[in-house]
Amino acid sequence: WQEHDPSENIAGTNLSENDLIASKKPTWKSALDSCAFTMSKGWDWVADDYSSYLKPWGFDPRDIKVPAVIWQGGLDKNVPKQHGKWLSENLPNARLEVRPEESHLGIFVNYEVEIMESAIALLK
């Protein structure tokens, strides 16, 4: 898995053209390396991830008191827009930041600084 460009691992997935462009940027390489490593170990994480849509989580998100910022791209084909909206409405101290022009990966690449600054601001 380390012998090739990790962005090849996402080719053919449900990613937009913007995501494929974002996946080639150097700032995204370490995240893709992590994804490639995770995928090389099996797909249990996928089943766990998708099962969270089908069964109770074991806690009530409304009980979470720490502040959060939820970032979502308007062109995201992987995470429904309703998911970010629902989370922001059910986490008492959350705010939703939507970037209509961004995709699933693109938001992290193109708003990297803003995302980190918003996380740091929550710690103050």
Predicted regions and their residues:
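Alpha/beta-hydrolase
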Residues: 1-59
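The feature captures the conserved acid-bearing segment of alpha/beta-hydrolase catalytic domains
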Residues: 55-65, 81
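Short beta-strand/loop motif that positions the catalytic acidic residue
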Residues: 64, 69-72, 76
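Histidine-centered active-site/metal-ligand motif
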Residues: 72, 83, 104
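Conserved alpha/beta-hydrolase "acid-adjacent" motif
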Residues: 77-83
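Conserved catalytic core of Hanks-type protein kinase domains
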Residues: 90
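Catalytic active-site module of serine/aspartate enzymes centered on a nucleophile-bearing elbow/loop
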Residues: 93-124
